[in-house]
Amino acid sequence: TVLLNQTGTKLAALGQVVIDPDTGEISAGLITEYQERDQDTQAFVDSINQEFSTVLSQVVASTDVALTTVDPSTGERIIRSQETNLGDLCADAYREVLDADVGLINGGGIRADIAAGEITYGDIISVHPYNNQATSVRVTGQQLLDALELGARYTPYENGGFLHAS
């Protein structure tokens, strides 16, 4: 027997696995409501937030339009099934940073919108919260086409591997 326990994202829940030592029975569940916060942990989190607040609030760019993961007319998330202005910008940025002919980013790695106006470093971290590394590789035209086709294989349905290209 293999027990699978997934808690979701953004720490919305904690996973709890209980093994009864007498019976060997295994149970799993999610904890989504908390009675009280641990004061030492909260103080630690607050100190980290304070330490990074200056860096995260630093303005690094601006935009005249909202940069989105959604369809502006319906509000439906589309970043994983079709192009968006934010996906295009991210792919453009990777192409520029890597001095490459083509820039690609998967829609599943783009996690937040950016409102029109000033863009902070914190906004960029919200869009790209993972510690992914930008990488440059040499590929053939066929390999590039194969990657694009693989990314679009579930269109029009959502797929975190949907590629935004520049």
Label every PLM stretch briefly.
Residues 1-59, 155-165:
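Active-site-adjacent helix-turn-beta-strand microarchitecture at beta-sheet edges
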Residues 2, 31, 35, 46, ...:
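A near-ubiquitous, low-amplitude feature marking generic local secondary-structure context
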Residues 2-3, 13-16, 24-27, 84, ...:
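Feature captures C-terminal
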Residues 29-31, 61-66, 136:
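Short amphipathic
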Residues 36-119, 157:
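Hard-cation-handling environments
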